[in-house]
């Protein structure tokens, strides 16, 4: 949301991407200036950062004992933002009010199974229209909880999930990522019991498996 408010463009990427091909291509092709990454995925970025000259900073979500020259913790970004807003709240308000419906908000990449991945440009109006459409078919109230069991780099997850629930004032929970795909799948029933969601965002294959288990 901070990136969108600032007029920037999000480029969500899958944690499954390999650094030497898929990840490197997407960072270079999108002209990304900043990379936000977890500690678990940081080694991938460190291996290819020398080949990404346009990347200015790597922002790490988890605290580390030491940071390399071009890395910084997310806590520092938050502190910088709070300090900036104390004296520049009007400037920031003018910035996000200048963002128009046709300005780019997101680049979503195709899988690239037969050729180089294609970057799909989505505007702010793409997002708001999808949220309005989602609100017409997803009935929920403020305070409701949605469990998302889909890859978060997919448009369906962050539009029908994150942004639609935000428009309602709802909450979002995600499934913890395991060391393997099977481990992640095993975390789904654990998350359901813990979160007790009113809504689950799924795809037909997973929904069929749930139905078989219920029947």
Question: Which residue ranges define each predicted feature?
Answer:
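A short helix-loop-beta submotif of the ANL/AMP-binding
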Residues: 1-20, 28-34, 144-145, 163-176, ...
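Conserved S/T- and glycine-rich ATP-binding loop of Class I adenylate-forming
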Residues: 3, 35, 104, 110-113, ...
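Structural core segment of the AMP-binding/adenylate-forming
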Residues: 5-80
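Short hydrophobic/charged patches on amphipathic alpha-helices used for structural packing
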Residues: 24, 46, 93-96, 189
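Helix N-cap/beta->alpha junction signal
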Residues: 38-41, 103, 203-204
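Conserved pre-ATP/AMP-binding loop-to-beta segment of ANL
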Residues: 60, 75-109, 116, 139-145
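Conserved AMP-binding A3 loop
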Residues: 105-131
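Conserved AMP-binding/adenylation subdomain of ANL enzymes
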Residues: 128-147, 152-215
